[in-house]
A protein has these predicted regions:
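N-terminal, charged low-complexity regulatory/assembly segments
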Residues: 1-217
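Residue-level detector of alpha-helix boundaries and kinks
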Residues: 23-24, 268, 338
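Charge-dense, low-complexity intrinsically disordered segments
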Residues: 26, 262, 340
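Residue-level recognition of well-ordered secondary-structure positions
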Residues: 40, 226-229, 340
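Short amphipathic alpha-helical patches
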Residues: 43, 62-67, 189-193, 197, ...
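Extended mid-to-C-terminal alpha-helical interaction segments
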Residues: 202-319, 327, 332-335, 347-352, ...
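Solvent-exposed beta-strand sheet faces enriched in polar/charged residues
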Residues: 324-326, 340
Length: 362
């Protein structure tokens, strides 16, 4: 068995980028679309445009964030970016990215140096992403290639506009947000470290991810765990170079909400929504009896696979199912993910509901 050294990190800088990612695809994370649109609407149109397009360029720049000095917050992000020449900011954020293969980055750097791109660059970039596999081909899909190339050809313009947009986002929303979430991050870190002292690594990862059960420990020498308020209950994965991986784990308390001032906790609301659907209740009953793949569930329910996947995603966001991860694609080419009911998640729903009802008005 691989021996993995466990490291820890904390800072609101991670949530600065995670929050932007989630605000641009709220439905995937169970966030109210209208509220997310309202946050984005606080920015000027040109600021919204560059932040939206940056999600296909920057994502969550794990390697760059990890190297930031303390206290690793939004102010440090903005200051560090401001110290770089504008044309180098995009390259700095993407350096070490695990979604964009090194050969693709080399092609894009050449585009940045020339200030333009040719059809041959597009073809070479598509080949580099396809050969890399592991999600890179999806991230470099045909509709994204032109956007990637256009912005890399205008790296200096991107660097100026992106920093200005990040500052505007900080002023309009995130400065207040990071003051709200910072205590929860440190509490989540302390709790995770306490769990790490008494659980083995696989059990720890399952607990912190609210139901992801890995078949084996990561094949890395070092694993960095960092709390994230916005990612709860999901995990964000990234690489920090050869042999070192980072995972953001959810640190939002069960009685808290992602939307500031919202009375009903997110975890409770997601769970009650999930349980209000008869198909999802049937799925939970099947998964209580045995673990099943999405394809097996589709056959039992006589539903199309995408429909079953949608229901499983809702149950996963509610923390009601365990997802057992081996190889995503088995040797026979079939999806090997298996789901099971998460008993502790079901118990948490009833405990949370009872606590909410007994709490009374604030």
């Amino acid at each position: 068995m691989t021996t993995v050294r466990l490291l820890w990190d904390v800072g609101t800088a991670y949530d600065l980028f995670v929050s932007l990612w989630i605000l641009h695809q709220p439905a995937d994370f169970g966030l109210h679309r209208a509220w997310a649109a309202g946050v984005r609407a606080r920015l000027l149109p040109e600021e919204r445009e560059v932040l939206e397009q940056s999600q296909e360029l920057v994502h969550v720049p794990f390697s760059w964030i990890y190297t930031l000095p303390e206290p690793k917050d939004a102010s440090v992000v903005l200051w560090t970016l401001s110290q770089l020449p504008a044309r180098e900011r995009l390259q700095a954020l993407v350096a070490g990215s695990d979604w964009l293969p090194p050969t693709a980055v080399d092609i894009l750097r050449g585009v940045a140096d020339r200030g333009r791109w040719e059809d041959s660059d597009r073809e070479a970039l598509a080949v580099a992403c396809r050969d890399a596999g592991s999600g890179a081909e999806t991230m470099c899909s045909a509709k994204r290639l032109d956007s990637l190339l256009d912005w890399w050809a205008r790296s200096e313009e991107f660097g100026k506009r992106y920093l200005a947009a990040l500052r505007a986002y900080q002023d309009a929303f995130f400065a207040e947000e990071e003051r709200r979430i910072a205590p929860a991050l440190h509490q989540g870190l302390a709790r995770a470290q306490e769990l790490a002292a008494r659980l083995d690594l696989l059990d720890l990862l399952e607990e912190l991810s609210h139901g992801l059960r890995f078949e084996a420990v990561p094949e890395v020498s070092e694993l960095v765990l960092a709390p994230s308020y916005w990612s709860t209950p999901l995990m964000f994965f990234g690489m920090l170079g050869s042999g070192r991986e980072i995972r953001l784990f959810g640190a939002r308390p069960l009685d808290a909400s992602l939307v500031p001032g919202e009375v009903v906790p997110d975890a409770l609301l997601q769970a009650l929504k999930a349980l209000s659907d008869p198909t999802r209740l049937r799925i939970l009953r099947y998964l209580t009896q045995e673990s099943l793949t999405p394809a097996e569930l589709a056959r039992r329910l006589r539903l199309r696979a995408p429909t079953v996947t949608h229901h499983l995603q809702a149950l996963r966001l509610a923390g009601l199912v365990q997802l057992k991860l081996g190889l995503l694609i088995a040797d026979d080419g079939k999806d090997s993910r298996r789901y099971a009911t998460r008993p502790e998640g079901v118990k948490e729903v009833f405990d949370s509901l009872r606590a909410f009802l007994e709490k009374g008005d604030n």
